[in-house]
């Protein structure tokens, strides 16, 4: 009986393995994307989470490279960040469901008009999950270690593909 069950289990495993695509496509986040951060609706425990700021977006060019089982989407074009402590270039690693970018940097805590910013160590993790329509949606969480802005800041993020202009003579 035990041999029969083992044989059935082995056949079932072979059946499932045989139904998987032989050369499944590797994930890719390449091309121009408008990356939007929904700062106006951010949340968290930090003083910074309650300071109003508008949503903001910039267009970035991403390029994906894969080696073995690891795929990384790197920002290869776009505006430089205002905060010089942000690691450059930004690199997002595919975790099987989302593009994830963990990094350490210095948060620049705004202390009001005319007052110097207070800098503090911070750790962020941004993730973007591909959607069926080609967009990516996710969240950006920052944990600020110390200072007047100590605590968390969490905001929704999204990336929208930027369509290239029509080619000359394409009739579009």
List the predicted regions and their residue ranges.
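A short, structured loop/turn motif at beta-sheet edges
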Residues: 25-32, 63-70, 92-99, 127-136, ...
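Tryptophan-anchored aromatic micro-motifs
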Residues: 25-50, 79, 136-140
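Short, cysteine-centered beta-strand-loop-beta hairpins and adjacent loop/turn segments enriched
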Residues: 39-51, 81-84, 108-117, 143-152
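Predominantly extracellular/secreted and cell-surface proteins with exposed
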Residues: 53-123
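Edge beta-strand at a domain terminus
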Residues: 137-172
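Beta-strand elements of well-folded, non-transmembrane domains
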Residues: 37-41, 64-66, 79, 142-144, ...
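Internal, hydrophobic beta-strand segments that form the core of beta-sheet-rich folds
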Residues: 118-145
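Secretory targeting and sorting signals
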Residues: 1-24
């Amino acid at each position: 009986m035990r041999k029969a069950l083992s044989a059935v289990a082995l056949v079932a495993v072979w059946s499932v393995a045989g139904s998987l695509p032989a050369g499944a496509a590797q994930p890719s986040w390449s091309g121009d994307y408008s990356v939007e951060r929904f700062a106006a609706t951010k949340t968290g425990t930090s003083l910074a989470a309650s300071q109003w700021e508008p949503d903001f977006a910039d267009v970035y060019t991403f390029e994906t490279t894969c080696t073995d089982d690891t795929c990384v989407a790197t920002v290869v074009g776009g505006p430089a960040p205002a905060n010089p402590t942000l690691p450059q270039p930004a690199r997002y690693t595919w975790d099987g469901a989302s593009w994830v970018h963990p990094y350490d940097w210095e948060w620049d805590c705004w202390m009001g008009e005319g007052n110097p910013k207070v800098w503090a160590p911070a750790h962020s993790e941004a993730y973007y999950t591909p959607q069926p329509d080609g967009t990516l949606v996710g969240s950006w969480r920052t944990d600020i270690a110390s200072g007047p802005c100590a605590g968390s800041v969490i905001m929704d993020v999204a990336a929208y593909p930027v369509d290239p202009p029509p080619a000359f003579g394409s009739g579009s």
